[in-house]
Amino acid sequence: MIYGYTEKELEKTDPDGWRLIVEDTGRQRWKYLKTEEERRERPQTYMEKYFLGKNMDLPEQPAAKTPIESARKGFSFYKHLQTSDGNWACEYGGVMFLLPGLIIAMYISKIEFPDEMRIEVIRYLVNHANPEDGGWGIHIEGKSTVFGTALNYVVLRILGLGPDHPVTMKARIRLNELGGAIGCPQWGKFWLAVLNCYGWEGINPILPEFWMLPEWLPIHPSRWWVHTRAVYLPMGYIYGEKFTAPVDPLIESLREELYTQPYSSINFSKHRNTTSPVDVYVPHTRFLRVINSILTFYHTIFRFSWIKDMASKYAYKLIEYENKNTDFLCIGPVNFSIHILAVYWKEGPDSYAFKSHKERMADFLWISKKGMMMNGTNGVQLWDTSFAVQALVESGLAEDPEFKDHMIKALDFLDKCQIQKNCDDQQKCYRHRRKGAWPFSTRQQGYTVSDCTAEALKAVLLLQNLKSFPKRVSYDRLKDSVDVILSLQNKDGGFASYELIRGPSWLEFINPAEVFGDIMIEHSYPECTTAAVTALCYFRSLCSHYRGPEINKSVKNAIQFIKESQRPDGSWYESWAICFTYATMFALESLSCVKDFYENSFHSRRACDFLVNKQEEDGGWSEGYQSCTDGIWTRHPTGSQVVQTAWACIGLMYANYPDETPIKRGINLIMSRQQPNGEWKQEAIEGVFNKNCMISYPNYKFNFTIKALGMYSKRYGNI
């Protein structure tokens, strides 16, 4: 029951009409077929039925009696979720501030909302509203915030829900309790300002002039973390020009609905630093407040038109580079939505750039049984496919006649997904080399990612080392991948996400976003470092003559980073999934590559003791997302999670933990949660980024459970 509505009473589309259109490059878009004739010509696949929450009509199987039977049964189900081009698709959702950017951009640029999109976005937001107070958080499991509530309220109003609808009324009450939209963090203020529901003078300056500073300055945006600079580039361009939507009746109404006082009475300039306490994750530092005061003075007094024009022109040139080098996908959905507005206001609705962005919107939208969301990228195609391959090879099932064709298709996808060309004007657009890299999603998105490159390289090597598999990726291309990985090692020995660390650590003191942590520069991560170590070690075992001394040095330095970043309790903190369990699994895998195991390694022993001490009474492991936000291990309130349990078991097995008992208990829990058709049900959210925002990785419940079961079977045999 949601605000007096049951799920059946919410307006919804017919789930029989949805189809996932997949291209051989990994591109995926949902399309709604309206006629019975269209639907008969293209019946729904098992995969589509699964994503829509429909009955797949797969036969039930007897409960698995051994871990390898469970792994086989799991992949017998999971193979049905593989797309026609060989990758594993899924939602990449859970983030509640992405849809508002797209919907606001569409509204301002007059892009029509298809009925099926309007209906399903409303349904998604209603389904994910806080059941107690009616608001929305920064992610689906988070508490209600001004950021989430104000922006998603705007979305519902744009899409047709009136201010007196039970859903909007309850959300507005919660927003008022939180102090109204005046307490939005900076990104929320930006979206309200472009919609003409907030004054530009109430936002701390976001100036495109930063891009014109000398590049040797530590504060130059090219030294920022890639996602941060990608967002603040178009944001700064629009702020610099003060583009805003013309006032219409809806905007006039929203102006009064979003605030606790009349809109005309608000002095926005006094609220540049007003952020609701419930939203603040990283408060403004004194250093940032001083910089903002200086920038405000400059912007108000000394920003001459010729400077503004020069800065805007340069910023827009960089926007064009981003569009070109990502085939109009952009690095992610936040800057994608801002780019829609930038090209609309600069080039107009009939321009090639605007039409290209419009055509790309479907790449980010995902339909589920709860409605339509906006994914955190254009998918997780490469990332999840790499782990699926590794799980099957680790389990000894890759050459199984039932599964081999699926692995060949996966290898074909990995082959097509590798980036084989550097960006044009690479230095001018501040991009790292990408020839030989693999991305997170698709080749067209085009960004080098360290762990994606490493995990994909490992997956390719594992398959191509099996005699019965074709050699799709040439030796020269494998060497290109190794070159990319080696180019990404930081001075501390660790590996970051997209690039080398370019800026000084003190840049984190000028983080303006308020809701995210560690976003100003790259940081070295245990997960990315482990991916690099394992890939390099496996490559070295097969091709020891290529850059051998450099690989040896790289691995040595990376392992030293892993050891030095271990916490006193034996764990590691990770920034891309939840959290200490995930990081500790990867760190133990790294240590195993250099034969550091429980019996001979102090670091491995401490890590194993940490994991074993966190085991639940039922044999599983349980860790909540607050571990990420608070930096302290926190138990998940619902108890053991199959994904967390798989991670812990995998880590202990990599470490050759001498007592089989805790591992066996974990494996038993994984097997007990398996459904008669072979699947595992979705449990708590798995991923995180920027410390404070959670994101879904639903394929982890297949990739890591199958891997854990297969590893156990190889090491211990049957239970």
Curated annotation (Swiss-Prot):
InterPro entries in UniProt: SQ_cyclase_C, SQ_cyclase_N, Squalene_cyclase, Terpene_synthase_CS, Terpenoid_cyclase/PrenylTrfase
Top-level EC class: isomerase
SUPFAM superfamilies for this protein: Terpenoid cyclases/Protein prenyltransferases (SSF48239)
PFTB repeat coordinates: 118-160, 478-523, 555-595, 604-645
GO cellular component terms attached to this protein's record: lipid droplet
PROSITE patterns (UniProt xref): TERPENE_SYNTHASES (PS01074)
Active site: 451 (proton donor)
NCBIfam families: squalene_cyclas (TIGR01787)
Family, as annotated: Belongs to the terpene cyclase/mutase family.
Name the UniProt record assigns to this protein: Lanosterol synthase
Organism: Pneumocystis carinii
Source lineage: Eukaryota, Fungi, Dikarya, Ascomycota, Taphrinomycotina
UniProt gene name: ERG7
